[in-house]
C-alpha cells in the first residue's frame, strides 16, 4: 500500500464530505465549499469522522493515483477549515505593487505597469508596497496565481531584483570582474 494513500483523512467538526457517483467529492466547511472529480478507479469511503481511499490492484498507475487521490481530498479538507496562504516579496529599485478592488497592478521596471485580476476564489492583499499575500481555500488556485505573479519578473541572480516567495532563497552570483 502507498504510505500516503493508506492514511485515513480525519474530518474535523463543522466539515461535511459528500461522495457522489463518478467519485465527485464535495467538501463543505466554515470557509466555503470545494468539489472535485477524482479518479474513478479509486474507492473512496466515509466511515464516521474519517475518509479512506483504497485501490483495486497494484498496477503502477493505481499506486500513483492512490496517494494523489488521498492528498487531493486532504487538501480540500484543510482548505475549507484553515485556507491557504502564499506570500510574495518584491525586491528592486522602483519595483512596487498597488491594489485597486480586484485588480493588482505591478510596477516591475518595464515600460508599462502589469495589471492582474484576482481569479475567482482567490484574494490578494498588500502588506506595504512590496509584500503580496495571496489567500484562498483552493490550494491549486492559490499556488497557480502566486506562480503567475512571480513569473512576471522572476528574481535574477546578480542583484536579486524581482518577485520571490518569502521562503525562497536566491542563489547569488558574483558579477564579472573588471580589467586591472
Residues covered by each model-derived region:
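N-terminal intrinsically disordered, cationic/polar leader segments
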Residues: 2-66, 70-147, 151-180
Amino acid at each position: 500500500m502507498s504510505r500516503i494513500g493508506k492514511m485515513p483523512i480525519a474530518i474535523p467538526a463543522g466539515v461535511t464530505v459528500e461522495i457522489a457517483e463518478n467519485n465527485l467529492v464535495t467538501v463543505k466547511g466554515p470557509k466555503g465549499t470545494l468539489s472535485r472529480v477524482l479518479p474513478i478507479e479509486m474507492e473512496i469511503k466515509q466511515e464516521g469522522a474519517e475518509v479512506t481511499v483504497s485501490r483495486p490492484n497494484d498496477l503502477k498507475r493505481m499506486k500513483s493515483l492512490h496517494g494523489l487521490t488521498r492528498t487531493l481530498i486532504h487538501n480540500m479538507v484543510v482548505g475549507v477549515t484553515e485556507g491557504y496562504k502564499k506570500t510574495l516579496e518584491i525586491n528592486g529599485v522602483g519595483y512596487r505593487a498597488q491594489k485597486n478592488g480586484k485588480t493588482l497592478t505591478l510596477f516591475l521596471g518595464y515600460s508599462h505597469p502589469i495589471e492582474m485580476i484576482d481569479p475567482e476564489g482567490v484574494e490578494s492583499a498588500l502588506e506595504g508596497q512590496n509584500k503580496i499575500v495571496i489567500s484562498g481555500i483552493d490550494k491549486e488556485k492559490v499556488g497557480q496565481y502566486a506562480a503567475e505573479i512571480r513569473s512576471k519578473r522572476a528574481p535574477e541572480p546578480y542583484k536579486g531584483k524581482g518577485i520571490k516567495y518569502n521562503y525562497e532563497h536566491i542563489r547569488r552570483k558574483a558579477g564579472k570582474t573588471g580589467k586591472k
